[in-house]
Amino acid sequence: FAVFNLTRTHESNMWEQMDGEPIAPDPAVDLEAIEVPPYFPETPKVRQSLARNYANIEYNDRRLGEILGELAEDGLAENTAVFVWTDHGPMPRGKRWPHDSGIRSPLIARWPGGIAPGTVREELVSTIDLAPTVLSLCGVEIPQHIQGQAFLGPRAAPEREYVYAARDRYDEMYDTVRAVRDKRFKYIRHYHPEQPY
């Protein structure tokens, strides 16, 4: 069992520099080809920030390829389940927000003999489901106190109807937002409606 945290897409890497030193390479992304989400202003700075994030994603993708290559070289690729989940990005409405841009992020599972390559599944899962899923794949009984539910393996649970999200703290500020989503709709409750967002 191993966990690799590729943090290049973390919020701290979206800035051009910190303390006068560059912290991310100039992105080789075509700024004009970037689709700016409708909730961002259409400015060169926003395009540069999005391009930097995409360049950081490409970096993580290359690093993941190296890790998968090492598994293959060691003869472990066909006997190893691999899960890749992503950061929700550093931009507003992503980091710390229960909007789709903050909670709908890719989860990729590679399980030789268990998942056919190219399979796409649309069920609602959450990162709290990873621990029970790993236990299920290992044939281990899932303790009652563990939150989440297995989505693969012999102890996979029936597909859930809802997922939940929350926003409580942003640095020194408190913000109370709750969300519940099914496959069609999301309800967001903001407990501080006096806030301008």
Regions found by a protein language model. Name each.
Residues 92, 131, 138-197:
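C-terminal cap/loop subdomain of S1 sulfatases and analogous C-terminal strand-loop tails that border
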Residues 1-131, 135-145, 188-197:
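Active-site-proximal cap/lid insertion segments
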